[in-house]
Every structure is written in C-alpha cells, then in structure tokens.
UniProtKB/Swiss-Prot annotation:
It comes from Bacillus thuringiensis (strain Al Hakam). Signal peptide: none annotated. InterPro entries: Metallo-B-lactamas, RibonucZ/Hydroxyglut_hydro, UPF0173, UPF0173_UPF0282_UlaG_hydrolase. GO terms for molecular function: hydrolase activity. It comes from the Bacteria. It holds the Pfam family Lactamase_B_2. Keywords: Hydrolase. This is UPF0173 metal-dependent hydrolase BALH_4194. Belongs to the UPF0173 family.
Length: 227
C-alpha cells in the first residue's frame, strides 16, 4: 500500500490497483501538488462537508465514475448533485472492493456554505476515517479537537499510520495532537491541516520532534510512505 500526502488534508491511497482520495481539496489549495483535471480516482472518502475537505469531489467523482463514501447527510447532499454515493455513519464499517472503511467520531462541524446566497446547509456529523487494506490500517482524523475516545480508537485498531491535524484555531493544535498521537498508538504519525491559511500556520517539524513512542514524519506535498 502506498500512502501519499498532497497538502492540507488531502491523502491518496494506492492499493490493489485502486486509487482512493481522502478530502480532495485541490482547486484553491495553495499547498497541493495535484490538479483536479489530472487526477484519476476510484473512490473518494469524505470526513465532513466543509469546502476545504469536499473540495473537488463532485467534479472528480463524475469524471472518474468514482464512488463517494461519506456520512449519511453529506452523501445525500452530494447524491442530489448527480454523484454516486455510499452513505455511512459514525461507528459503521463497510467492506468495499478497494478496502474496508469505518467512520469514527470527530469533534468539529459539518456544513455546506453558500456564500452567494448566504445560506448554510447542515451536512451531518463530522467523522474520522479508518481505512484498511492489505492488512494495513490508515487513520485520517479529519478535522477534530482532541477527545478522550481516541484512546478507544487506538485500543481497538492496529493503526499503521495516523494523519492528525495540527493547525489549531479550527482543529486541535500541536500540543493536543501530541497527546492524540499517544492515544491512537499509530506506528507513524503525519501532521496535516496546517499552513494552508495564515490562521493555521504551524511548524510541523517541531510537532514531530515532540512525539514519543511512534515515528513522526513530515510529508511535503507529493511525498509518500509505503506500508
């Protein structure tokens, strides 16, 4: 399994001949190395409905005939836009032909904001994502605060790599993320959701230096690890 980081919270997983994208915010993302028009994808996993996570989902899904796996309300909202969706919810898991997906808790918001009409559409609960294939497990925490049930996520799952937000302001910051890393017990921890906007500027190298009992790894856009 090859797992690569592409700026902000964008993660790509390549396994068994399939390509999976998590939170494909590409257009307008100054930190990504990907262009939506060049991306080929079989499945898209979404943690929640904010624009910097849904991103280019509709365009990518339609162009590639990709399935979008998302919390129920968000999946329903996207299905109304002509997207092939598979709705799930927190605590639920499903075995797909590309791997197993399970949604976990995350403490954040989830909505679609229409700036032009000044409306906000509720898109369900935010989630974290556990993805398992080839006997390897990836945990993408989505946007979240620190919460104590991360201990359960670590106890119940043998996590090979965890992608944790460190940007602060909208999510947990580096100090809380260090504790999150301890609780989820991943072998490798990669920081995400930082430096895309001024309000979430952080030094990822300082973060990984503080990690204990795991390998911290800063991935620049386009860099990958093999599990």
């Amino acid at each position: 399994m090859k797992v690569s980081y592409h700026g902000h919270s964008v993660v790509k997983i390549e396994t068994n001949g399939k390509v999976i994208l998590i939170d494909p915010f590409l257009t307008g993302n100054s930190k990504t190395d990907l262009k939506a028009e060049d991306v080929k994808v079989d499945a898209i996993l979404l943690s929640h409905g904010h624009g910097d996570h849904v991103g280019d989902t509709v365009e990518l899904a339609k162009k590639n005939n990709a399935v979008v796996v998302a919390p129920f309300e968000l999946a329903t909202f996207l299905s109304w836009q002509g997207v092939n969706t598979h709705p799930m919810h927190i605590g639920g898991s499903h075995e797909f032909d590309f791997g197993k997906v399970k949604f976990t808790q995350a403490f954040h918001g989830s909505s679609y904001i229409d700036e032009e009409n000044k409306t906000i559409t509720y898109t369900g609960m935010p989630a974290g994502i556990l993805f398992t294939a080839e006997e390897k497990t990836v945990y993408h925490a989505g946007d979240t605060a620190l919460f104590s049930d991360m201990k359960l996520i670590g106890e119940l799952n043998n996590i090979d790599v965890a992608f944790l937000p460190i940007g602060d302001n909208f999510t947990m910051g580096p100090e809380d993320a260090v504790l999150a890393a301890k609780w989820v017990q991943a072998k490798t921890v990669v920081p995400i959701h930082y430096n895309t906007f001024p309000v979430i500027e952080q030094d990822p190298y300082q973060f990984v230096e503080k990690l204990q009992n795991c390998t911290g790894k800063v991935l620049e856009a386009g860099e990958s690890i093999t599990l």
